[in-house]
Design a protein with these regions (language model features):
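Active-site acidic/histidine clusters and adjacent loop/turn architecture
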Residues: 25-66
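Short N-terminal edge-element motif at the start of the domain
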Residues: 56-86, 92
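Charged, low-complexity intrinsically disordered regions
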Residues: 5-40, 121-223
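Aromatic- and glycine-enriched beta-alpha-beta binding-site module
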Residues: 78-142
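Conserved aromatic-histidine-acidic binding/catalytic patches
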Residues: 43-50, 54, 93, 194-198, ...
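Short, mixed-charge, low-aromatic patches
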Residues: 12-15, 45-46, 87-94, 162-164
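Short, surface-exposed, charge-dense and proline/glycine-enriched linear segments
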Residues: 72, 95-109, 147-153, 179-183
Length: 223
């Protein structure tokens, strides 16, 4: 599938995701309780479901290259407070328990500039007493741009460029308890993609880059 040019503007091949990103942060109300907003709520629901399906299709196509990875459930199109949430994510679990660090695909950005990041992380609500220790072993692996860190400091996620200096800094901050957890991430553009194949090729290259970080979280690397 190729980009379609229309009246001087390009239509993204991920048109459902692009359309739903516009609605980020809106409040969803059950159509039966929405009164005169009923049609708007039905539109929100339709766009949310379509975007989620489009994202899930990409995830499934990617997962076919890695049949040993098991797909966890894709995030919903709204959160528990019924706020529209277009930045979907999907974990891909390898061997081991669901508490283990794993791969995840996560949407990011806005309608004009969006993409999907591949990351090594874990599911917070399923973590155990060893999850954080295993996750932070990603700092044992040498890093280079465009891979980057996302570190949680005082409950806030902060991005750090993938440099040796930042690797050493974050390692020290983890030891002193200033940093709780560190993810490694690699962004892949979707907004300007011209084909699904292009995106999948890029994601496979990204996976190759991140595998050493994932392997560092395994029991084999315990010291």
């Amino acid at each position: 599938m190729l980009e379609i040019e229309k009246k001087g503007a390009y239509m993204s091949i991920f048109s459902a995701i692009e359309a739903y990103l516009v609605l980020q942060g809106n409040k969803y109300i059950s159509p039966d309780k929405a009164g005169e907003l009923r049609e708007m709520m039905l539109d929100f629901k339709q766009k949310g479901q379509a975007a989620r399906a489009e994202f899930l299709d990409l995830v499934k196509q990617f997962q076919r290259f890695y049949p040993k990875l098991t797909l966890e459930r894709t995030s919903n199109w709204m959160n528990q407070a019924q706020i529209l949430r277009p930045h979907f994510w999907n974990y891909l679990r390898g061997c081991g328990d669901v508490t283990e660090p794993m791969f995840a695909l996560r949407l990011y950005g806005n309608p004009k500039d969006f993409g999907v990041s591949l990351e090594v992380s874990f599911i917070e609500r399923k973590k155990d007493e060893t999850s954080l220790t295993k996750q932070n072993r990603v700092l044992q692996v040498p890093i280079a741009v465009p891979v980057y860190y996302l570190a949680q400091i005082n409950g806030v996620s902060q991005r750090f460029t993938g440099t040796e200096e930042n690797r050493k800094y974050l390692s020290q901050q983890v030891k002193t308890g200033q940093v709780r957890k560190v993810l490694v991430k690699y962004d892949v553009d979707l907004a300007q993609a011209t084909s699904i194949r292009q995106v999948l090729d890029k994601l496979q290259a990204t996976m190759t880059t991140l595998i050493p970080f994932y392997e560092a979280t395994r029991e084999l690397y315990e010291v």
